[in-house]
């Protein structure tokens, strides 16, 4: 199965609507970056993901360090990823990193990076 995983920071205070918007930013950013990339493997994964109903899993990380560590692992494995920074117009300071999106990619590649995290 091909899936997308969004990792949300649980150490910062965000309302439910704010958190939902940040998760949406991560998902949309990932899809746009794949469409605009020249990576044929990523595009194959995107097409499979779309055909499979766009499975998304949202999990939580306890710190910014966890987000950075997992983004580096995704980068090392050449997986699509996006780090979302808040614009700072409502609840958070500008530039606050709120979440990390990884995928769409095969679950056997994503699970070693995010499989230990708890569902949000």
UniProtKB/Swiss-Prot annotation:
Compartment(s): Cytoplasm
Keyword list, A-Z: Cytoplasm, Hydrolase
Gene3D superfamilies: Bit1
SUPFAM superfamilies recorded: Peptidyl-tRNA hydrolase II
An individual GO BP term: translation
GO molecular function ontology, one term from the record: peptidyl-tRNA hydrolase activity
PANTHER family: PEPTIDYL-TRNA HYDROLASE 2, PEPTIDYL-TRNA HYDROLASE 2, MITOCHONDRIAL
Role: The natural substrate for this enzyme may be peptidyl-tRNAs which drop off the ribosome during protein synthesis.
Protein name: Peptidyl-tRNA hydrolase
